[in-house]
From Swiss-Prot:
Alphabetized CDD domains for the sequence: LipB
InterPro entries on file: aa-tRNA-synth_II/BPL/LPL, BPL_LPL_catalytic, Octanoyltransferase, Octanoyltransferase_CS
Active-site residues, Swiss-Prot/TrEMBL: C198
Ranges where the BPL/LPL catalytic domain occurs: 54-238
Residues the entry annotates as binding substrate: R92, G93, G94, Q95, L96, T97, Y98, H99, A167, I168, G169, G180, I181, A182
Keywords: Acyltransferase, Cytoplasm, Transferase
Keyword Nucleotide-binding: no
Family according to the record: Belongs to the LipB family.
Known EC number: 2.3.1.181
The protein's name in its UniProt record: Octanoyltransferase
Compartment list: Cytoplasm
Length: 245
C-alpha cells in the first residue's frame, strides 16, 4: 500500500528514514567530470532496478551535468523561454529546472520499503538534508509548504523576497527512489533566466547559490557537509568501489 502523509512536511517525522540496525551502508560515489544527462539517467535506472531486485546496495551519486534543462512530469513547454541548452524530459516530479557546472546534483537511490514507504516523509527528509548541509555554512535554509525545495530569505532585495538555493525532484519505482536534489554552489545563475524555474514566475522568488550569498566555498566543502548531514538523517555511508556503478 502506498503511504502518502497529509501532514505539513515540516511536521513529518523524517527521522524514521534510517534503516534497521545491521543494514548495509549506503554507497557514496562522486564523479569528478560532468556526466551527460542521458548517461546519468540510464545508470540510475539500472542501479535502482538492481536495488529493487536485491542485487545491489543503496547508492548516493554526486555529480555535475553539462549545461542543460530538464522538464519533470508537471513541466510545461511555455516555461522554456529560450532554447539555450538541450532540454530533456524526465520521469521525476516537478517542472523545469537547470543543471550545469557549479551545481551539485545528488542522485539518491534508496529502498524505502526498508526505511519508510512514505513519499512526503521522504521529500521532507531530503529537505532536511539540504537544510542541515546549509547550516554547516551558517546559511539558514527553509522549506515552504507551497514550494518544494529549500529557500533563503533575501531582505536585501525587499520585503517578502526569497531565493531558491536547492531543488528537489523525485520518482519512486518499486519503492526505490530515483533522482534527488540539486544545490547551487557556484553555477551561472543567468542560465535560469531562460526558463520559469519550477513554474514560479513571482518576481519575489528568485534563484541563488552559496557563492552568490558571499560564501567562499568549493564543491569539496559542500560534499563533506552533504555526507555528514546525510548520515545523520539516512544512516551510515561507505565509499563506493572505484570502478562501475
Amino acid at each position: 500500500m502506498i503511504n502518502i502523509s497529509t501532514s505539513p512536511r515540516q511536521t513529518l517525522d523524517w527521522t524514521a528514514l534510517k534503516p534497521a540496525d545491521g543494514s548495509p551502508a549506503v554507497e557514496w560515489r562522486i564523479s569528478d567530470s560532468p556526466v551527460p544527462y542521458p548517461e546519468a539517467v540510464a545508470t540510475m535506472e539500472a542501479r535502482a532496478a538492481a536495488i529493487a531486485a536485491g542485487e545491489a546496495t543503496e547508492l548516493v551519486w554526486l555529480l555535475e551535468h553539462p549545461p542543460l534543462y530538464t522538464a519533470g512530469t508537471s513541466g510545461h513547454a511555455s516555461d522554456l523561454l529560450e532554447e539555450r541548452f538541450p532540454l530533456f524530459t524526465t520521469g521525476r516530479g516537478g517542472q523545469l529546472t537547470y543543471h550545469g557546472p557549479g551545481q551539485r546534483v545528488a542522485y539518491v537511490m534508496l529502498d524505502l520499503k526498508r526505511r519508510r514507504p512514505d513519499v512526503r516523509a521522504y521529500v521532507a527528509a531530503l529537505e532536511q538534508w539540504i537544510i542541515a548541509t546549509l547550516d554547516a555554512f551558517n546559511i539558514r535554509g527553509e522549506r515552504r509548504e507551497d514550494r518544494v525545495g529549500v529557500w533563503v530569505r533575501r531582505p536585501d532585495k525587499g520585503v517578502g523576497y526569497e531565493d531558491k538555493i536547492a531543488a528537489i525532484g523525485v520518482r519512486l519505482k518499486r519503492w526505490v527512489s530515483l533522482h534527488g536534489i540539486a544545490i547551487n554552489v557556484e553555477p551561472d545563475l543567468s542560465h535560469f533566466k531562460a526558463i520559469v524555474p519550477c513554474g514560479i514566475s513571482d518576481p519575489r522568488y528568485g534563484v541563488t547559490s552559496l557563492v552568490d550569498l558571499g560564501l567562499p566555498v568549493v564543491m569539496t566543502d559542500v560534499d563533506i557537509a552533504l555526507r555528514a548531514a546525510f548520515e545523520n538523517i539516512f544512516g551510515e555511508t561507505r565509499a563506493a568501489a572505484p570502478a562501475g556503478i
